[in-house]
Amino acid sequence: MRAVGRPDIGGEPMPPVFRAFDDNQIIFRRAEVSMIAGQPGAGKSTLALALALRMQAPTLYLSADTNAHTMAMRLYSMITGNSQSESEKIISENPEQAKQALAQARHIYWSFDSNPGLGDIDDEVTAIEELLGESPALNIVDNLMD
């Protein structure tokens, strides 16, 4: 097999982020496809965002149905523990404070294309490879069905 002994190809475990996942042997691996499925409103996007934030690994996050402002508000809430309404107010009234907190997520690279194709995703990955000299360790496609 080509992948044996080649960690640069992928397969190594991503950093653990939730004890419940560890306890149940749920492991996300670099460059592998994992699907988070559930009913609308079940928290799939929130879980994906929390994974990206906590893993602290270079991440491409493609959000097809949520805008940049909403994602910044959710992320700020995760980082600070504020409610989303408090976070929205701080982002609007004190953007410098928000930017400082959001810097904890500088390892996440965003795409808000509402209808990305495979070529678009490949272009995003290539851009990150050129920027970092390596592929993103985690790729999140939020809302695969749209």
What are these regions (language model features)?
Residues 1-82:
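The Walker A/P-loop phosphate-binding site
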Residues 59-146:
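Conserved inter-motif catalytic segment of the P-loop NTP-binding fold
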